[in-house]
Amino acid sequence: MARIAGVNIPTNKRVAISLRYIYGIGPAQAQKICTELSIPDERRVNQLSDDEILRIRELIDREYRVEGDLRREVAMNIKRLMDLGCYRGLRHRRGLPVRGQRTHTNARTRKGKAVAIAGKKKVTR
């Protein structure tokens, strides 16, 4: 397995597919990296030379924020919103949807498992 940006990428897959295993690199960025370094689409990771792997590694380190740095940046952005006390920060703090989705029904992923409410107690006369 080739190791790029601290991630072991699979060797039997195509380069553009394998690069997606790195957090912060999606389909468009992976394709852009391959075209920028003139790596053919059908080339697999185990067919790359050490020089090509080194060029990919250097390009990603130089041009992209990936893995820990990107996760830290996203977490800091969310923390900043929460510290500001703005609407989005309050929604993050309460664990509710941030982008305007309805919450009367749905939003179970964000709110967690539904808690059953005990039915009304019957009053005996």
From Swiss-Prot:
Domain of life: Bacteria
Keywords: Ribonucleoprotein, Ribosomal protein, RNA-binding, rRNA-binding, tRNA-binding
UniProt-listed InterPro entries: Rbsml_uS13_C, Ribosomal_uS13, Ribosomal_uS13-like_H2TH, Ribosomal_uS13_bac-type, Ribosomal_uS13_CS
One matching Pfam family: Ribosomal_S13
One record GO biological process: translation
Gene Ontology molecular functions: rRNA binding; structural constituent of ribosome; tRNA binding
GO CC terms of this entry: cytosol; small ribosomal subunit
Gene3D superfamilies cross-referenced by the UniProt entry: 1.10.8.50, 30s ribosomal protein s13, domain 2 (4.10.910.10)
HAMAP family recorded: Ribosomal_uS13
Family to which the UniProt record says this protein belongs: Belongs to the universal ribosomal protein uS13 family.
Entry-linked NCBIfam families: uS13_bact
Oligomeric form and interacting partners: Part of the 30S ribosomal subunit. Forms a loose heterodimer with protein S19. Forms two bridges to the 50S subunit in the 70S ribosome.
Chain's role: Located at the top of the head of the 30S subunit, it contacts several helices of the 16S rRNA. In the 70S ribosome it contacts the 23S rRNA (bridge B1a) and protein L5 of the 50S subunit (bridge B1b), connecting the 2 subunits; these bridges are implicated in subunit movement. Contacts the tRNAs in the A and P-sites.
Protein name: Small ribosomal subunit protein uS13
Organism phylogeny: Bacteria, Pseudomonadati, Pseudomonadota, Alphaproteobacteria, Acetobacterales
